[in-house]
Amino acid sequence: MSVIAILAMVVGVQAELKQINVIFRHGDRIPDEKNEMYPKDPYLYYDFYPLERGELTNSGKMREYQLGQFLRERYGDFLGDIYTEESVSALSSFYDRTKMSLQLVLAALYPPNKLQQWNEDLNWQPIATKYLRRYEDNIFLPEDCLLFTIELDRVLESPRGKYEFSKYDKLKKKLEEWTGKNITTPWDYYYIYHTLVAEQSYGLTLPSWTNNIFPRGELFDATVFTYNITNSTPLLKKLYGGPLLRIFTKHMLDVVSGTQKKKRKIYLFSGHESNIASVLHALQLYYPHVPEYSSSIIMELHNIEGTHYVKIVYYLGIPSEARELQLPGCEVLCPLYKYLQLIENVIPSNEELICDKRFVDESANNLSIEELDFVKLNLIRIAGTENK
């Protein structure tokens, strides 16, 4: 612990919370048919009515609501009990499950104060949220971006990349027989794993071949390998976890410099487990695991007698408990200047944030002619523009 932090404890000076940034994973969901379902999946044609593929289950809805309750309990004194538009920013990816997860977190985080109660029978109030369309999203889904794809392909085609991937050849052969799916990239292991997670969470009985490889075992190892290889170079870290870190950091610096446009207290980002893993990788805090449903990285900005500190909290989701993480080379309560030094090499530049997904078939199909006409050649998401 730093000298200032120790002295603060000795003389009884309290750290003053100034801002909170949160990136969290959506809740439990139904398997997503586009990438995850495999030909021999016994639930390939299962009727999940009234749910559609990829949507939140009731368990997932409750888990996100509980995340909101956790945030309310931990930060209630700081946030206050009255919602104001300028106090919170809420952004999600374009998936329905992340949009709904964001609404559920907000419902628990900001139940209506008596002053704001508009229906005595409903302990809820509407709160504005925003989302990024897939073709403009290099925050939650940067793996679609051309520069990321080029760099990852370079890594996978390198001698080292081929060697690391070949370590799972025995698993590959067995999985192809069991699933009927051709395994050609690390993502294939990843998608099979997450299909099994979703089906198990829903209460479905998994095939017997999963017993020795899931949730721990070779398939888990191959999925962890996917997280590792997709964050294995400085550029991949910049492009994957870097955009969120850049946004978090700009938000904090705006507070410190007094240039914050609105008096934001909390920024909520509703995304995916890949966002949790990539931010942990960028911070050199990742350990072999698959981030659980509703897991969250929380970055707190504190002030102790004029000196600013950063604290990182990992809400595990399952179980619903939190851990304070210590950045390598710093303390749990890390001086802001030291934090800035530690993350300097994983913050992307404007040029590295350039991401045009118009030529990705899936994204292009979702655009109207008018939208295609107006999309700029280079889409640069400048961190912190939602403050304006």
Swiss-Prot record:
GO CC annotation terms, alphabetical: extracellular region
Catalytic activity, EC: 3.1.3.2
Primary location: secreted
One MF annotation (Gene Ontology) recorded for this entry: acid phosphatase activity
UniProt keyword 4Fe-4S present: no
Gene3D superfamilies reported in the protein's UniProt record: Phosphoglycerate mutase-like
Glycan-linked positions: 182, 228, 366
Alphabetic keyword roster: Allergen, Disulfide bond, Glycoprotein, Hydrolase, Secreted, Signal
Tissue: Expressed by the venom gland.
Source superkingdom: Eukaryota
Leader sequence residues: 1-15
Reactions it catalyzes: a phosphate monoester + H2O = an alcohol + phosphate
Disulphide bridges, residue numbers: 145-355, 330-334
Top EC class for this record: hydrolase
Active site: 26, 273
Subcellular localization(s) per the UniProt record: Secreted
Family statement: Belongs to the histidine acid phosphatase family.
Listed name of the protein: Venom acid phosphatase Acph-1
